[in-house]
Regions:
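Short cationic amphipathic helices and targeting signals
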Residues: 9, 45, 134-136
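Single conserved hydrophobic/aromatic residue that forms the stacking wall/gate
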Residues: 1-7, 11
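NAD(P)-dependent aldehyde/semialdehyde dehydrogenase
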Residues: 14-129
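Conserved C-terminal structural/oligomerization subdomain of aldehyde/semialdehyde dehydrogenase
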Residues: 78, 82-199
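Small-residue (primarily alanine) positions within well-ordered alpha-helices
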Residues: 6-7, 67, 125, 144
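Charge-dense, low-complexity intrinsically disordered segments
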Residues: 1, 45-49, 181
Length: 199
């Protein structure tokens, strides 16, 4: 499940869970936070104070609700005394009833949830009021397509596919909005249709 079109939740089988947490932790800790004009920066500041305060509040709420803070947190990254910068943050031991698994965060925060069966993963993915985008990763492309078809989101990327061509529509399901941008569907969203009826 994603908010904006960046992943905010990752679902891993119980048998792969610990390895996934270690990989995510290493990736987050290697990610450089800084000013966009500086070489090496991978994540810049949050766009405004309202969004920044929301991200910090949700990180703190994740801890309060019992998720394990693997790395990151709501304090400024090392080397920053001001600005809307957020450390890349990873949570494990997240359950789908926690706020960080259910809300749009729009910040560098990743929650890792466990599942046992494919059907359970789909159920978790769909148990949200949002549905903008999602991702499916699998060594079996046909199976990945089957899972993608079960997820209620406006865009599903399979095996890292991130590039939408100009003809591919983009937009969400549920409270992530209706209507589409891009492609013919996006063009039709900008048109006004008129019917003229005469004898």
């Amino acid at each position: 499940r994603t908010f904006s079109s960046a992943a905010s939740d990752v679902y891993k089988r119980q048998s792969q869970y610990d390895d996934a947490v270690k990989i995510a932790k290493a990736a987050a800790e290697a990610t450089v936070v800084g000013y966009p004009n500086e070489d090496g920066t991978k994540i810049g500041p949050i766009s405004n104070i309202t969004k920044y305060e929301k991200v910090k509040r949700l990180i703190d709420l994740g801890v309060e609700e019992g998720a394990k803070l693997v790395t990151g947190g709501s304090e400024l990254p090392d080397g920053f005394e001001k600005g809307f910068f957020v450390k890349p943050t990873i949570f494990s031991d997240v359950t789908n009833d926690m706020t960080i698994a259910r809300e749009e965060i729009f910040g560098p925060v990743l929650s890792i949830l466990k599942y046992e069966t494919e059907d359970e993963a789909v159920e978790i993915a769909n148990d949200t009021p949002y549905g903008l985008a999602g991702y499916v990763q699998s060594g079996n492309p046909e199976r990945a397509k089957q899972v993608a078809n079960k997820i209620r989101a406006g865009q599903i990327s399979i095996n890292g596919g991130r590039s939408r061509g100009p003809s591919a529509p983009f937009g969400g399901f549920k409270t992530s909005g209706n209507g589409r941008e891009h492609g013919m569907l996006g063009l039709h969203e900008c048109l006004e249709t008129k019917a003229i009826i005469g004898n």
